[in-house]
């Protein structure tokens, strides 16, 4: 088997990793940021669009993200009791 075939098999075995975009609301912890991820859902009965905000703790190895930055998160293994996401990249810096 070739090397590329082996890496494709390991990626398939690992599974799909979720990604989310959100706004950094806190960067006071070392190598950790709190990101607010907004989800828009329509109400089942009334049809009104409801904004649901979820605050996720994400690992930021270089401490690159600051408050107000838009970041891309990717799901990862549990890094602590509450941290299951990591910052992939800073999409937009705060003004």
Swiss-Prot record:
Matching entries from Pfam families are given as: Ribosomal_S17
A GO BP term here is: translation
Which molecular function GO terms apply here? rRNA binding; structural constituent of ribosome
Say yes or no: keyword Ribonucleoprotein present.
Answer: yes
Q: Any idea which UniProt keywords this protein has?
A: Ribonucleoprotein, Ribosomal protein, RNA-binding, rRNA-binding
**Domain of life of the organism encoding this protein:** Bacteria
In terms of PROSITE patterns, this protein maps to: RIBOSOMAL_S17
GO CC, alphabetical:
cytosolic small ribosomal subunit
What NCBIfam families does this protein's entry cite?
A: PRK05610.1, uS17_bact
* Family label: Belongs to the universal ribosomal protein uS17 family.
| Subunit-structure text | Part of the 30S ribosomal subunit.
Q: Which PANTHER family match?
A: 40S RIBOSOMAL PROTEIN S11 FAMILY MEMBER (PTHR10744), SMALL RIBOSOMAL SUBUNIT PROTEIN US17M (PTHR10744:SF1)
Q: What does this protein do?
A: One of the primary rRNA binding proteins, it binds specifically to the 5'-end of 16S ribosomal RNA.
Q: What is this protein called?
A: Small ribosomal subunit protein uS17
Provide the species name: Streptomyces coelicolor (strain ATCC BAA-471 / A3(2) / M145)
- Designated gene of the protein: rpsQ
């Amino acid at each position: 088997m070739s090397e590329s075939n082996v890496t494709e098999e390991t990626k398939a075995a690992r599974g799909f990793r979720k990604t989310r975009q959100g706004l950094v609301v806190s960067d006071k912890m070392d190598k950790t940021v709190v990101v607010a991820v907004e989800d828009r859902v329509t109400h089942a009965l009334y049809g009104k669009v409801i904004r649901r905000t979820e605050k996720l703790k994400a690992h930021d190895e270089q401490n690159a993200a600051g408050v107000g930055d838009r970041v891309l998160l990717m799901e990862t293994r549990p890094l602590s009791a509450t941290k299951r996401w990591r910052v992939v990249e800073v999409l937009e810096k705060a003004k």
